[in-house]
Structure formats: C-alpha cells, structure tokens
A protein has these predicted regions:
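Extracytoplasmic soluble-region selector
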Residues: 1-40
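Preference for long, amphipathic alpha-helical scaffolds in soluble/luminal domains
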Residues: 35-223
Length: 223
C-alpha cells in the first residue's frame, strides 16, 4: 500500500524491491518466504516460567557440583532463595571444595572457579567464604587465569564484578597478581583490527566477542 506495508496473500516465496521515490536509482531487494503464522501464546509468561522452574527442579532434585546452570537460571528466574534447592546446592558444593582441598579442575580451566563465584553469588552466598574458603584466591594469579585463553580473563572479570565488595586477595606466589585493571587491559589488548576478538588465531569469533563485551560492559562509560 501507499505507506509501504506489504501484506502476503498466500504461502510461498517472493521478492520484494524497495525504491526511493525521489531517487529511483536507489533500490534494494530481498527474498522472503511466507509461512503460516505461529499459534498465539495461550499461556502467560509467568505461567511458562513457573512450569519451566518446576520442570528443572524435577530434573535436578539433588543439586550439586555440575548443577550450576540450573541453579543460576532458577535464581535469576525469580525462585525464592529460601527454597531448599539452593541450600542443598551450596552445602554439596562447599563439601566438595573442602574434600578436594579447593580443587575444582585438574586442567587450566580456571573458569570453573569464576563460574562457581557467579552461581553462588546469585544463590545469595558470599563466594569469599564457601565453607571458609575464598574462591577468589584460586584466580588471583593472572598468569594461570590467562592459560585458558580469553575465556579465563573474561569470566574472572565477570566474577569480580558480580558483587561490589569482591576483590582479588594478595597472592605473593603469583607470577602476575590479578586485578580488575589488569583483566580489562588483557581484553582490550586482545582486540583484533576492525573491533573483534578470537578464541584462537586472528579470525573474528562472534561467540567470544559477545562474551568479551559482556566482561567489558561495566566499563562502557569509559569508552
């Protein structure tokens, strides 16, 4: 019609071309596929959220190490932190850390600590005192965190910024003392030409770029 709205009359494929009236030399075309519209949502968002929460808890009845994304999703989704689900996860995690003398990984995946910090904080707990253990001490050596590639610094920065009182404890044996500024510099210095980041090599990677921007989002006002 005259307002520029295009209405399909049947299913199928078509080509739509738009032209600027005053400048007919300016035009663009796109291919579209017309399909039957999806059914309208019959349930409210809150009802769907409640059903999803119930399903997750039914699938994960005894949350422990390995339940992190369930715990984070339920906590951020609004499930009361007073629910036994969260205390069960915390107790299992604290016991696991104590039994394994603080070890959450036997590789360079120090994101395991950052992930627990994020989840436990969402759970309403203080990651600096998990059964008496400060999880930040395990990611206080920047050189170790960097061994995992960009994911290490990204997740360490996310963990650090998930609570205003968090900080890295002094680590006298560290090859490089970790700090907020140091992590930001690592990410900024890893930026590729054209404004992107890569997990490996020099090819822009949309996934790692998205994660890097999440880590740097706190500092967007400084750009």
């Amino acid at each position: 019609n005259k307002s520029g709205t295009v209405t399909a009359v049947k299913n199928g494929k078509a080509v739509i071309t738009a032209t600027v009236k005053e400048h007919p030399e300016l035009s663009a075309s796109c291919n579209i596929t017309v399909m039957q519209g999806a059914n309208a949502l019959k349930k409210s968002v809150s009802q769907v959220m409640a059903e999803t929460s119930a399903y997750m808890r039914a699938k994960d009845t005894n949350p422990s190490v390995g339940s992190e994304w369930f715990v984070l999703g339920l906590a951020r989704g609004g499930l009361s932190l007073k629910e036994r689900y969260f205390s069960t996860y915390y107790n299992h995690t604290a016991n696991y850390i104590e039994e394994n003398k603080g070890s959450l990984t036997n590789t360079t995946k120090y994101t395991e600590y950052s992930k627990r910090i994020l989840v436990l904080t969402a759970d309403g707990k203080d990651a600096r005192n998990v059964g008496g253990d400060n999880l930040f001490k395990y990611i206080s050596d920047r050189s170790l965190v960097k061994e995992q590639g960009l994911n290490g610094p990204i997740w360490a920065l996310l963990a650090l910024n998930c609570h205003p009182e968090y900080s890295f404890p002094k680590n006298s044996s560290a090859k490089g003392q970790n700090s907020e500024d140091a992590l930001v510099n690592v990410l900024m210095q890893s930026e590729l030409s054209g404004g992107g980041w890569a997990l490996i090599g020099n090819n822009h990677d949309s996934d790692i770029k998205g994660m890097t921007l999440q880590g740097l989002a706190t500092y967007s006002h400084q750009a």
